[in-house]
């Protein structure tokens, strides 16, 4: 699905100049909470740079994303940014675009062989694991963590998990992880959480529940409160508005997050800078190592970033 000017809540493709056009395929525009601020950030950067962006919505369909990229090739956009659903499945279309002379970058998900704009997901996982260990510092003995995962096989999920496991192993803590494949969906995460509570019905059986991000944790916090399981500690990655409220209330211990609005700006700014430099292989210095921010209730007032 291609989004034209003003087609979706004023956040979709916005034309500012016909001189340079960026085609963008992003996971799911209507059902993925973080897509809204990302697209807003991209529009802001496009307006400032005087370029045009065209946003396509594959709706979490990997084959549709492949079609998006091929359509961009047919339309002869100047560059393509892909927020990948399937980092392997998208490769043939990426290679076709490159053979056609169109530069492609991966955004918030690494695609083999092309530049990547986004946080280091391996380090993102490490940072979150350290936050979880901090949250569990007063918990003695073995620890069981429920973890809401993203899309199986996607590089953000895989690399974040790898980073978490590295930190847990190095800590020497006795930690068991109960993974819930939630596909970045708050609804699927809640269903998985309800299953965890059935499997571990006694207080103390499940010490902490964490999320890979995308606003998956708040419904489970509410469910825990409603069902007398408020002893469970919660942490998450990413920062949506309901996460903000939960941290301030103290029902969410803390958050490790990237500012997704700024990440949207960064994607466009990076391609504009690459075009000006005539080099689509090397990331500009400003696009390397975007910050990962950690906030808890104790530090929240001093934290910078946007909830979505």
Locate each region found by the language model:
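Bacterial N-terminal signal peptides
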Residues: 1-12
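Immediate post-signal peptide segment of exported/extracytoplasmic ligand-binding proteins
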Residues: 14-23, 47, 136-144
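Hinge/cleft segment of the Venus flytrap/periplasmic-binding protein
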Residues: 18-20, 152, 156, 167-168, ...
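Structural detector of well-ordered beta-strand residues that form the stable sheet scaffold
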Residues: 23, 54, 103-105, 146, ...
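Hinge/beta->alpha junction and helix N-cap segments in small-molecule ligand-binding domains
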Residues: 25-40, 55-64, 86, 118-128, ...
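Short, hydrophobic alpha-helical segments
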Residues: 49, 73, 132-137, 197, ...
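Flexible loop/hinge segments that line or gate small-molecule binding clefts
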Residues: 52, 87-123, 130, 134, ...
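Hydrophobic alpha-helical
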Residues: 70-73, 78-98, 164, 178, ...
């Amino acid at each position: 699905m291609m989004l034209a000017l003003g087609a979706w809540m004023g956040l979709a493709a916005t034309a500012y100049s016909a001189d340079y056009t960026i085609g963008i395929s992003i996971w799911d525009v209507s059902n993925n909470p973080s897509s809204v601020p990302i697209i807003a950030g991209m529009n802001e950067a496009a307006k400032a740079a005087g370029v045009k962006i065209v946003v396509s919505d594959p709706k979490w369909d990997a084959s549709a994303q492949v079609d998006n990229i091929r359509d961009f090739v047919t339309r002869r956009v100047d560059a393509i940014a892909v927020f990948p659903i399937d980092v392997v499945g998208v490769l043939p279309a990426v290679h076709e675009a490159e053979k056609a002379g169109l530069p492609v970058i991966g955004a918030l998900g690494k695609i083999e062989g092309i530049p990547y704009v986004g946080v280091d997901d391996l380090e993102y996982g490490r940072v979150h694991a350290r936050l979880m260990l901090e949250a569990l510092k007063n918990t003695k003995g073995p620890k069981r963590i429920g973890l809401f995962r993203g899309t199986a096989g996607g590089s953000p999920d895989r690399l974040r998990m790898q980073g978490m496991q590295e930190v847990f192993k190095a800590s020497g803590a006795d930690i068991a992880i109960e993974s819930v494949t939630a596909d970045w969906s708050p609804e699927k995460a809640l269903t998985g959480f309800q299953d965890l509570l059935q499997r571990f019905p006694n207080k103390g059986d499940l010490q902490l529940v964490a999320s890979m991000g995308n606003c998956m944790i708040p419904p489970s916090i509410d469910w825990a409160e409603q069902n007398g399981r408020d002893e469970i500690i919660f942490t998450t990655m990413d920062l949506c508005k309901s996460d903000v409220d939960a941290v301030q209330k103290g029902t969410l211990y803390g958050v490790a997050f990237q500012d997704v609005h700024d990440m949207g700006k960064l994607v466009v700014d990076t391609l504009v800078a690459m075009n000006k430099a005539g080099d689509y292989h090397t990331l500009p210095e400003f696009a390397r190592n975007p910050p990962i921010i950690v906030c808890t209730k104790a530090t929240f007032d001093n934290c910078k970033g946007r909830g979505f």
